[in-house]
């Protein structure tokens, strides 16, 4: 089988002038998340920074996600609801939202996670202060019922290309980048780890800086992709390095092993119990 190279597409960086400095585009894929998505949307609506648009792309949910989201979008025009014609995965859903995004600032929030009310305001202020174009924050873990499990996850203060290859340090729900400086890079077509694949693409252009504040809550669900078997995660990491990062068989294997080591390191060093 031929080893095909993936070339990331970079969408136009032309932004409407009135939005060039303030608008945040929030990228939210969803699939059968009716139980949680209302709470997620409310956490965005409660932001102290109100200049945002929330692009919710539904990957053909079979529950009543559409009814819940439409109730919000009918009363808040900043919420844009898009339904895909076929179930295609989170990468396709996120890419669809990216193509529609009008904001300078691009942020990511999955449909079962939550933001603290000052997340956008504080993170943008931090990025402007240090002139960063790519950043992430600490986040807490919550259980399916929304109760905190007393864990805070952090990471390195600065993540360059080499360190990003070592491990996926940023939590997707905390990442923000400056579209003016970086552009809109297409997420590689991979079922799992597609957020990590995007961070790797962005790391070619800019380092990722940690804003060392807890500004989001990640919902740990037993049925989510993030809770897949350990062996499956290892296989998908190898697939990412081999097929998306175009590494040799040997390099992909070494990077995968390296990821296992740094994953253990992150749990020991950057996971704090309250």
Language model features with spans:
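N-proximal low-complexity "stem/linker" segments adjacent to membrane-targeting elements
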Residues: 1-45
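Cell-envelope/extracellular polymer assembly enzymes that use nucleotide-activated donors
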Residues: 22-25, 53, 197
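Conserved donor NDP-sugar-binding/catalytic core segment of glycosyltransferases
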Residues: 118-149
């Amino acid at each position: 089988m031929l080893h095909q190279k993936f070339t990331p597409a970079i969408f136009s960086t032309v932004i409407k002038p009135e939005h060039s400095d303030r608008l945040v585009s929030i990228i939210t894929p969803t699939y059968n998340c009716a139980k949680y998505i209302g709470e997620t949307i409310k956490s965005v609506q409660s932001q102290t920074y109100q200049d945002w648009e929330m692009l919710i792309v539904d990957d053909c949910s079979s529950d009543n996600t559409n009814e819940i989201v439409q109730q919000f979008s009918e009363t808040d025009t900043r919420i844009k609801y898009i339904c895909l014609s076929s179930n295609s995965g989170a990468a396709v859903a996120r890419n669809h939202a990216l193509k529609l995004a009008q904001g300078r600032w691009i942020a990511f929030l999955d449909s079962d996670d939550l933001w603290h009310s000052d997340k956008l305001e504080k993170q943008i202020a931090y990025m402007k202060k240090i002139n960063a174009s790519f950043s992430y924050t600490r986040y807490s873990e919550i259980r399916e019922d929304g109760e905190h499990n007393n864990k805070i996850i952090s990471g390195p203060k600065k993540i360059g290309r080499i360190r990003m290859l070592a491990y996926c340090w940023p939590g997707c729900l905390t990442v923000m980048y400056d579209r003016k400086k970086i552009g809109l890079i297409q997420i590689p077509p991979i079922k799992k780890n597609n957020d990590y694949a995007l961070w790797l693409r962005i790391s070619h252009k800019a380092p990722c800086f940690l804003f060392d504040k807890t500004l989001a809550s990640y919902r740990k669900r037993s049925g989510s992709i993030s809770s897949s078997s350990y062996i499956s995660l290892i296989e998908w990491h190898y697939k990412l390095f081999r097929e998306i990062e175009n590494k040799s068989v040997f390099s992909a294997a070494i990077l995968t092993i390296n990821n296992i080591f740094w994953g253990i390191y992150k749990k020991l060093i950057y996971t704090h119990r309250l």
